[in-house]
Amino acid sequence: MRFTDGGEGTFGANAGLPTVALDLLKPITDKYVPNTISNADLWALAANVATEAMGGPAIKTRFGRVDASDSKASVESQVGRLPDGDKGCDHLREIFHPKGFTDKDIVALSG
């Protein structure tokens, strides 16, 4: 999400994140990345904190992710990991069933 020349921010599944979440995380990023925490770990931590703040479960954050070196590498590492918003239920199953999600789980994730 940190690359201005593309990257994951261009994925339909991430619509809105580059403007909303990035703006919220920018002061933290400027202060702590990369010396204290990677961008990837910061985003994971932020997602877990947001989940708990909204009444969801507390999720343990595991640290140690390594940031992609450029926008091309960040895109290549994510291809096929997130669903395309304009595809149907078979596409969602292709993405989530291999990760152990049931149809019920997929519906909950999809909102």
Predicted feature descriptions by range:
Residues 1-111:
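Soluble secreted/lumenal catalytic domains
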